[in-house]
Swiss-Prot record:
InterPro entries: Ribosomal_uS10 (IPR001848), Ribosomal_uS10_CS (IPR018268), Ribosomal_uS10_dom (IPR027486), Ribosomal_uS10_dom_sf (IPR036838)
UniProt function note: Involved in the binding of tRNA to the ribosomes.
Subunit field text: Part of the 30S ribosomal subunit.
Gene Ontology CC: ribonucleoprotein complex; ribosome
Alphabetical list of Pfam families matching this protein: Ribosomal_S10 (PF00338)
Keyword Lipid biosynthesis applies: no
UniProt protein name: Small ribosomal subunit protein uS10
GO biological process terms held by the UniProt record: translation
Family recorded in the similarity comment: Belongs to the universal ribosomal protein uS10 family.
Native source species: Mesoplasma florum (strain ATCC 33453 / NBRC 100688 / NCTC 11704 / L1) (Acholeplasma florum)
Length: 102
């Protein structure tokens, strides 16, 4: 019989909040007896935005801002229905985007 995998992908702008969320999810999943693989750090997306400092002239004077999106992957092997119920009830901070695939 092939083992089932639940993949949880977390995204956010602050890596510390993502790591705290991962620890909460691991603690909840291991409490139900499921095996957890990860956290696996995924590549960070970096978006750079360049704007002109002056409104009318001085095109050579520019300012750059960047926005980094940190990502982590967590795999739960052979999740039970109780594991899924517990994961639905985990309270996570705002600023963390979660994708769950079975």
């Amino acid at each position: 019989m092939a083992e089932q995998k639940m993949r949880i992908k977390l995204k956010g702008y602050d890596h510390a909040i993502i790591d705290q969320s991962i620890l909460k999810i691991i603690e909840a999943a291991e409490g139900t007896g499921a095996k957890v693989r990860g956290p696996i750090p995924l590549p960070t997306d970096k978006q750079v935005i360049t704007i002109l400092r002056a409104v009318h002239k001085y095109k050579d004077s520019r300012e750059q801002f960047e926005m980094r999106t940190h990502k982590r992957l967590l795999e739960i092997l052979n999740p039970t229905p109780t594991t899924m119920d517990v994961l639905k009830r985990v309270q996570l901070p705002s600023g963390v985007d979660i994708e769950i695939k079975l």
